[in-house]
Each structure stands twice: as C-alpha cells, then as structure tokens.
Amino acid sequence: DDLVGQEHIIDILKGAVAASRTGSDSQEMTHAWVFTGPPGSGRSSAAVAFAQALICPNQGCGACNECQSAATGGHPDVEVIRTEGLSIKVEEIRELLTRVAWAPSMGGWRVVVMEDADRLTESAANALLKAIEEPGTRTVWLLCAPTLQDVLPTIRSRCRHLQLRTPSIE
C-alpha cells in the first residue's frame, strides 16, 4: 500500500517472492538488489516491503508477526541499516557482516536493507562487495540509493537494479 505508482516494481518483486518460494533457478530471484529513485519515490519502503514478503509465511501480508516485526526493525532475520552520519564506515560493515553470517533463525531468508548505500566509504563498499560476491546461503542484500551511479560499479554490476519513479500527484 505504501508503494503508490510503483506497479512495475511491485510486479517484479512479487515474481521474485514467488520464485524464492519454489526454489526456482529463474532470474526472478537474486541475492542482491539495488533500489534507486529520487527522494519520495519509496525506495526504502519498497526494500522493506520486499524483506517482509520474503520472510512472511503469507508472502507479505503486512499483518502477521513476521511482517510487523520486520517493519519495526525487531525481526531477527531482517537487518535495516540507516545512518545518521555522512558516511557508512568499514567498521560498521564488518560488524554487519559478522551479524549476518549466520543462517536465518526464523524464516527462509536473512535480509539486509541498506537505506543509504550511496554513503558507503570506498573501504566499506569494498568490504560489502566481498559479501555480495560470495553471499551467505539464504542471504539477500537490498541496497537503496538515489541513482545507480551513486553505487560502486563493482557492487552495482552484481545486483539487480530496480528504478522507482516519483509518483504523480493524482
């Protein structure tokens, strides 16, 4: 409901969730995604909704305990990274990688939503790159940035890109 005017994105994410449930080897589900779009486009909301759908037994109902705890940051298999500072430092990424190295504890996926991937320092981006190149089993990375060019080329080349639009006023 929060993704007004993003039907094209919703359809892609629904296909990915369905593929993740069946274990399909299709290209619909992948371990790393980049959500881009201007401020107000809902890129972080889309990433969190996708995380909810991946861990929800009902494919993202929004009402169950799993969805609610993912939305509020309390689900053990969903890590939402928000930064208050100007950058995300390598120490923060190394700590994150330690936390997400384990298999999911409750659901089928461990999901990391990074709201400000454009704020990664070069060394932090390189540390993250290693994790994206060699993903943990059942780990999904959801990176958010204003534009694709804001993400290190070596990272974006390993991610599926979703471009959100600014919704119309209507």
Predicted regions and their residues:
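Conserved D-loop-proximal element of ABC-family nucleotide-binding domains
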Residues: 90, 121-123, 153
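Conserved catalytic/switch belt of AAA+ P-loop NTPases
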Residues: 101, 126-143
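P-loop/Walker A NTP-binding region and its immediately flanking N-terminal helices
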Residues: 1-118, 140
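A short beta-strand-to-loop transition that corresponds to the Sensor-1 phosphate-sensing loop
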Residues: 115-116, 143-148, 166-168
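Short regulatory helix/loop adjacent to the ATP-binding pocket of P-loop NTPases
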Residues: 127-132, 148-160
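Sensor-1/coupling segment of RecA-like P-loop NTPase cores
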Residues: 120, 135-152
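Conserved AAA+ ATPase "SRH/arginine-finger" region at the nucleotide-binding site
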Residues: 82-84, 160-169
